[in-house]
Curated annotation (Swiss-Prot):
PANTHER family: 40S RIBOSOMAL PROTEIN S11 FAMILY MEMBER, 40S RIBOSOMAL PROTEIN S11-RELATED. GO terms for cellular component: cytosolic small ribosomal subunit. The keyword Ribonucleoprotein applies. This is Small ribosomal subunit protein uS17. PROSITE patterns: RIBOSOMAL_S17 (PS00056). Pfam families: Ribosomal_S17. The lineage of its organism: Archaea, Methanobacteriati, Methanobacteriota, Stenosarchaea group, Methanomicrobia. Part of the 30S ribosomal subunit. One of the primary rRNA binding proteins, it binds specifically to the 5'-end of 16S ribosomal RNA. NCBIfam families: PRK08572.1, uS17_arch. InterPro entries: NA-bd_OB-fold, Ribosomal_uS17, Ribosomal_uS17_arc/euk, Ribosomal_uS17_archaeal, Ribosomal_uS17_CS. Keywords: Ribonucleoprotein, Ribosomal protein, RNA-binding, rRNA-binding.
Amino acid sequence: MAQNIGLNVQPPKQECKDVNCPFHGTLPVRGQVITGKVVSDKMMGTVVVARDYLHYVRKYNRYEKRISKLHAHNPPCIQAKVGDLVKIAECRPLSKSTTYVVVEVQQP
């Protein structure tokens, strides 16, 4: 049975025994909720999520497109793949570079 994590997301249908799962483990989520695209899933239990944003260049009075890459824990009950549009939520640091967890794979 998936527990309520305090966000407006659908809980996963599968169950897992991951301690760092916000639905079936003890990992609390708080802070930012970001939507992005999975660009890599080669790490064990972690995905790289890229999000686009605009940066203003004052000299030219224009905006340039930039990409920010974030590492997010991928619980076994969610299993996000490359190309998926995912919603990630901030949590406590799980490793040196992983401070987000995947909470939902959004349907295109």
